[in-house]
């Protein structure tokens, strides 16, 4: 087999008949599969052992040779080679066709490649291929020209002969008539009889003349057709064609079916055609030019590659290996078979019948019909259903053809090449393990034993508990006591990977050190639940085992959960205290007024601990404590003689002293009440300042303290804890009266329905807020429900309002607010009507969530596809450029404060230029990493904006460079070379997709003014679609004039430079952003609404459209409170603007109208300019992510994304070569991905094991029988059951 590591690129092309015969190991001549009695393959059939290899290892068909020692011998009796059975997965056969057929991909695809090449309409092409019309394939123009006078004379003579014969015939008839009349007269017949005879004779003479004239006309028609005949003419009239062939057969050739096309392609002059097309492009206009451009693409593809157009017509069909289209016996003795066998059988049957008809010399019409059926059979085999009705199997199910095998989620690409099931894995339900450390997980003993089985067996043999692997295996299966001790030893320091589906971002798979636990559930640490988005209501997780030393090292160093505290999307910690932990820490840091022991002094925390143990002080009592080892809090005012490092006395509580013991040494003492936000801020600060190990230890300490004190805080919720405000009825009365007044005014006709609605909505919104305030004021501090909300542990005030205040206004299915409020709360209970109108919103919410999940998943898939080859390829690209970002703004008091968006824009980037203050002094040099501390320094120096490096300005030819990307948000350090930043970006944008809303907001019930928001808006931006009702932007600088007509406004801009005025018609409903006489700059938005990004690109250029898109995407995410760093969005947008559209090709090899990557365009121009030629010109193009993914240079990546057959057709014609730079291409062919530790600079390092390591190496393979089993490149040996398409082996999916 081919070793994937020995080639660097993969080319696809058209196979000729000779190629197919070369691949083949023999011709399949019979449609038989296996013998019904012996169940062995039939000779020369679809499963023939002679062609495809033996069905049993080292055994021929007739059984003469059985054993490895006969390896390589070909049995002289049955002709089968003695070899391994797995060759049946790789050996191909072929079918020799009795008549050529066209390949349906090239004729039926859109656009039809065959049609473009031959300049034939697809309809005409179909007529020829399916035997409905003849096609002229060759005309001998010279001899026709030479012999034309002779032929004309000959035709003239023939016409004269016809004329003479007609005259003679008419004359004879005339004579006969006269004789008849004379005879009748002699007999004395009546005039009536004589008239009848005369009419009959005249009719006959007329027929003679007509017949003769018709023959002469036919002669003229045949001769005219012959005179004007040219190659590629179609002739649907069979009689006319036969006449032509009989008379002038030596001057032309013609035919029908694929054979005619084959002759045509054989004589096709590509170079001449390309030259004439180039001439058309130079001189032509409009449609003609556009068609010539499209045709030139196809013609030049054949011209510039080794492909021959003859490859589009097949003389023989390849037969794929039998183990890839298996036939297996089911329990009932029936057989299940792959659809391909049925399709191949149809081809073979029709082919054999056609051969027989040809041998018999059957009439042409019968043979042509059989040829047509053969063509249709091959079409169905390649792409069933592409033309006409699909071939169906039992139960009217369309059969799966070769194309269907590749397409879609269940196709070869996505099901088997990009995602495989792996060994050494298990899955189980998860439960919480509060006793675990952050880097640990609890693994059920039985599962661990099964996962680590080979390691345990090897160790048992090493420790002499077992004689050989076989007995060790028996020991493990019987679970002897010694096995558990060995298991304990084997799993120490051997990390396992845990994964929870759906894996939306890289934190969905993390490594943990396993701890053996009883039971059958996996235990996970409570702090990693956020990253996995896991809860314990029945979620399941999968466990995978890294086997090799390298895999274990990577799992431990890169994937261990304690090394993944930060979110890759925002760079802030994800492992935050939540729920009970928040409650516990909140309880610890609280102060109770007048509690036991208030005001006492203690000389140390230990003394306070004694008092607490003796129950002399309350946890939350205010006490004075002398602290020695701590750093005082920032707000503490030190006495005059105090020096840093001295002990100090602080008014605090014993709880806060305990809390500070959980924090690292030297961290300022925290003397405040900590709700969730404050706790998050502390974790955030720790992550910025301390190493990861310390942060993980602190988090564990906080977790333990949180759980311990949450238990002891006694927070419980009873129904009496939901306290409704006592004055609720009075508040409601007041608003009831106001609402009544509005209803009366409406009844009298003072208000329109619209006004009444908005008034009522306003009144009841006020009422709801008033009641919420009263309710909040009414809650006692110590109320458990209030504590839960106040600490941030669970719920929010809106939910409490619904429990204890009033539910307020709800919306109907259309999304409009119903002006009747729900006055009750859940504590009192709703009336039936109130309950009923509540159900609208609830039901819509659930339906929305289901739709959103699917849409969000699809968006993530497209984002991954467009950005998968963006990898950090170099340290520094050396660019001077960057983008200007705002880092601070003036507060209300005129002091600079940090800009609220600095978190997602300037944070974690490298500075592109020095940050210089007003005095011209450098505060921070270029190249520095803008962390929180650096940003603080810059703001202190009074600088408002800085220039930072960005992926948008990076000049790396492939991927991005480390400095332009800046800090890796997941690690907090400068990004490593080899980091797959594109995929991280796609995950960071896609993962919160499910949190975005689906709705289109209705502004005041006006249908036309919907503003698209949420997920659909993000999709609209990334797909670069023109938004509905787009807002125009000014193309010039000038003054505004506004003209009103009945239906529209016209915004007219009078340019400053005196050129022609530009008018923008806008609807009267739109809100104008400009006033009469106002001066506007280029690119100013004229009305409210979404701007078309293509317009921004055209008017303001690529940089502005990049910033516009980043800003617009961020707007959607910010509105939902999701924090994503700009750099992720920039990477996607960089991919959208990677290509240019060639306008003039100059002397380059580029074609006008072609989309090429900017790097290739610049390289080609550089080459042409160096030799003194004329360079090409182009303009930048903004492509949506789907289109950009399909336009990628890598055909493997594009084919595995969407439109598989179209991509492969195109790639094959262009003989495209995939240089394997992205991730998907390498996964597909089974190479290490060129990212992370797979990039070449890491792959070239060899690690030599020490002697101890060599001794301790565990062998993993072949523990079944002690022998080393060689597995081929296609997976396990033939003993394995093959899942068939008929049975739906769906993956278990997400059980949540």
Swiss-Prot record:
GO cellular component: a single term: DNA-directed RNA polymerase complex
Obligatory cofactor(s): Mg(2+); Zn(2+)
Residues the entry annotates as binding Mg(2+): 535, 537, 539
Pfam families, per database record: RNA_pol_Rpb1_1, RNA_pol_Rpb1_2, RNA_pol_Rpb1_3, RNA_pol_Rpb1_4, RNA_pol_Rpb1_5
Binding locations of Zn(2+) 1: 60, 62, 75, 78
Family listed: Belongs to the RNA polymerase beta' chain family.
Protein name: DNA-directed RNA polymerase subunit beta'
Protein's organism: Parafrankia sp. (strain EAN1pec)
């Amino acid at each position: 087999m081919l070793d994937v590591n020995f080639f660097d690129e993969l080319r696809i092309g058209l196979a000729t008949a000779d190629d197919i015969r070369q691949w083949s190991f023999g011709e399949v001549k019979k449609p038989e599969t296996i013998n019904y009695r012996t169940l062995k393959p039939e000779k020369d059939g679809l499963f023939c052992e002679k062609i495809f290899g033996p069905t049993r290892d080292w055994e021929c068909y007739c059984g003469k040779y059985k054993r490895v020692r006969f390896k390589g011998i070909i049995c002289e009796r049955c002709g089968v080679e003695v070899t391994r059975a797995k060759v049946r997965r790789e050996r191909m056969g072929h079918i020799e066709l009795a008549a050529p057929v066209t390949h349906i991909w090239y004729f039926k695809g859109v656009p039809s490649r065959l049609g473009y090449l031959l300049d034939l309409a697809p309809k005409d092409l179909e007529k020829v291929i399916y035997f409905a019309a003849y096609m002229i394939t060759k005309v001998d123009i010279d001899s026709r020209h030479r012999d034309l006078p002779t032929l004309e004379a000959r035709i003239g003579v023939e016409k004269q002969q016809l004329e003479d014969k007609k005259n003679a015939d008419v004359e004879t008839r005339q004579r006969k008539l006269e004789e008849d009349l004379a005879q009748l007269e002699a007999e004395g017949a009546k005039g009536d009889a004589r008239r009848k005879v005369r009419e009959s004779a005249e009719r006959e003479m007329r027929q003679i003349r007509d017949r003769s004239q018709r023959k002469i006309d036919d002669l003229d028609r045949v001769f005219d057709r012959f005179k004007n005949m040219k190659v590629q003419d179609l002739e649907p009239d069979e009689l006319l064609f036969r006449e032509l062939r009989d008379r002038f057969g030596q001057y032309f050739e013609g035919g029908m079916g694929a054979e005619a096309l084959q002759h045509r392609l054989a004589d096709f002059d590509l170079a001449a055609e390309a030259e004439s097309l180039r001439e058309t492009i130079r001189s032509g206009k409009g449609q003609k030019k556009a068609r010539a451009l499209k045709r030139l693409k196809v013609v030049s593809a054949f011209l510039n590659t080794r492909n021959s157009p003859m490859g589009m017509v097949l003389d023989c069909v390849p037969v794929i290996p039998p183990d890839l289209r298996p036939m297996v016996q089911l329990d009932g003795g029936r057989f299940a078979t792959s659809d391909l066998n049925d399709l191949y059988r149809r081809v073979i049957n029709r082919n054999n019948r056609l051969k027989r008809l040809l041998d018999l010399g059957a009439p042409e019409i019968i043979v042509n019909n059989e040829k047509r059926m053969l063509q249709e059979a091959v079409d169905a085999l390649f792409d069933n259903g592409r033309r006409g009705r699909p071939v169906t199997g039992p139960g009217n199910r369309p059969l799966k053809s070769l194309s269907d095998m590749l397409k879609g989620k269940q196709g070869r690409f996505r099901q088997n090449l990009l995602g495989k099931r792996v060994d050494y894995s298990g899955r189980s339900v998860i439960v919480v393990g509060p006793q675990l450390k952050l880097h640990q997980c609890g693994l059920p003993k039985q599962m661990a034993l099964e996962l680590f089985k080979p390691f345990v067996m090897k160790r048992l043999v090493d420790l002499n508990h077992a004689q050989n692997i076989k007995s060790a295996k028996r020991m493990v299966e019987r679970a002897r006591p010694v096995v558990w001790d060995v298991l304990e030893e084997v799993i120490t320091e051997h990390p396992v990977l845990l994964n929870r589906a759906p894996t939306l971002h890289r934190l969905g798979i993390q490594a943990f050190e396993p701890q053996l636990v009883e039971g059958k559930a996996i235990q996970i640490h409570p702090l990693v639940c956020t990253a996995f988005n896991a809860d314990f209501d029945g979620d399941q997780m999968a466990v995978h085992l890294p086997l090799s030393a390298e895999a274990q090292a990577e799992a431990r160093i890169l994937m261990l959960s304690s090394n993944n505290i930060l979110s890759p999307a925002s760079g802030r910690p994800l492992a935050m205290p939540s729920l009970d932990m928040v409650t516990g820490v909140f309880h610890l840091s609280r102060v109770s007024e007048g509690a036991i022991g208030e005001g006492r002094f203690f000389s140390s925390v230990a003394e306070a601990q004694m008092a607490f143990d003796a129950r002399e002080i309350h946890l939350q009592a205010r006490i004075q404590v002398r602290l020695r080892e701590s750093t005082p809090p920032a707000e503490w005012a030190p006495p005059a003689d105090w020096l840093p490092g001295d002990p100090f006395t602080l008014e605090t509580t014993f709880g806060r002293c305990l809390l500070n013991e959980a924090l690292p040494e030297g961290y300022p003492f925290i003397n405040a009440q900590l709700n969730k936000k404050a706790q998050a801020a502390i974790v955030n600060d720790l992550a910025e300042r301390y190493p990861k190990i310390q942060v993980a230890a602190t988090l564990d300490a906080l977790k333990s303290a949180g759980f311990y004190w949450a238990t002891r805080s006694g927070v419980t919720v009873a129904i009496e804890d939901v306290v409704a405000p006592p004055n609720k009825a009075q508040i409601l009365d007041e608003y009831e009266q106001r609402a009544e007044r509005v209803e009366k005014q409406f009844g009298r006709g003072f208000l329109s329905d619209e006004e009444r609605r908005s008034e009522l909505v306003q009144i009841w919104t006020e009422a709801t807020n008033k009641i919420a305030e009263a309710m909040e004021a009414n809650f006692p501090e110590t109320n458990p429900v209030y504590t839960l909300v106040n600490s941030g542990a669970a719920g929010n005030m809106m939910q409490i309002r619904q429990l204890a205040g009033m539910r307020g206004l709800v919306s109907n299915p259309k999304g409009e607010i119903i002006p009747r409020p729900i006055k009750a709360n859940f504590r009192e209970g709703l009336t039936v009507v109130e309950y009923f109108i509540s159900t609208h919103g609830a039901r819509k919410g659930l339906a929305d969530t289901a739709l959103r999940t699917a849409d969000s998943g699809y968006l993530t898939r497209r984002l991954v596809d467009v950005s998968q080859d963006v990898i950090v390829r170099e340290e520094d690209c050396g660019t001077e450029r960057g983008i200007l970002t705002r880092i601070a703004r003036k507060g209300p008091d005129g002091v600079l404060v940090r800009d609220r968006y600095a978190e997602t824009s300037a944070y974690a980037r490298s500075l592109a230029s020095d940050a210089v203050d007003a005095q011209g002094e450098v505060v921070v040099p270029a190249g520095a990493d803008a962390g929180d501390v650096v940003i603080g320094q810059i703001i202190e120096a009074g600088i408002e904006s800085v220039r930072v490096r960005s992926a948008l300005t990076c000049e790396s030819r492939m991927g991005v460079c480390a400095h332009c990307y800046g800090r890796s948000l997941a690690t907090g350090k400068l990004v490593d070379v080899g980091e797959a930043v594109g995929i991280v970006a796609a995950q960071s944008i896609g993962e919160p997709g499910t949190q975005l809303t689906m709705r289109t907001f209705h502004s005041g019930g006006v249908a036309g003014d919907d503003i698209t928001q949420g997920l659909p808006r993000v999709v609209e931006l990334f797909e670069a679609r023109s938004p509905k009702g787009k807002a125009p932007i000014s193309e010039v600088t000038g003054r505004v004039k506004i003209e009103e007509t009945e239906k529209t406004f016209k915004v007219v801009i009078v340019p400053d430079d005196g050129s022609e005025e530009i008018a923008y018609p806008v609807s009267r409903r739109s809100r104008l952003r400009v006033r009469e006489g106002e001066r506007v700059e280029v690119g100013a938005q004229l009305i409210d609404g979404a701007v078309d990004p293509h317009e921004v690109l055209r008017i303001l250029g690529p940089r502005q459209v990049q910033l516009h898109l980043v800003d617009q995407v961020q707007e959607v995410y910010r509105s939902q409170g999701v924090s994503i760093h700009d750099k992720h969005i920039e990477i996607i947008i960089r991919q959208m603007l990677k290509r240019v559209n060639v306008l003039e090709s100059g002397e380059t090899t580029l074609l006008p109208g072609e989309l090429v990557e900017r790097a290739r365009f610049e390289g080609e121009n550089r080459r042409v300019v160096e030799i003194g030629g004329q360079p090409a010109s182009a303009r930048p193009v903004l492509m949506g992510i789907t289109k950009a993914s399909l336009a990628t240079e890598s055909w493997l990546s594009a084919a595995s994304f969407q439109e598989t057959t179209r991509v492969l057709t195109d790639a094959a014609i262009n003989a495209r070569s995939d240089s394997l730079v992205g991730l998907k291409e390498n996964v597909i062919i089974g190479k290490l991905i060129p990212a992370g530790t797979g990039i070449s600079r890491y792959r070239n390092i060899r690690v030599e094991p020490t002697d101890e390591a060599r001794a301790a190496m565990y062998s993993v393979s072949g523990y079944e029988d002690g022998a080393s089993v060689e597995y081929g490149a296609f997976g396990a040996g033939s003993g394995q059951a093959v899942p068939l398409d008929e049975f739906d082996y769906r993956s278990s999916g997400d059980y949540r």
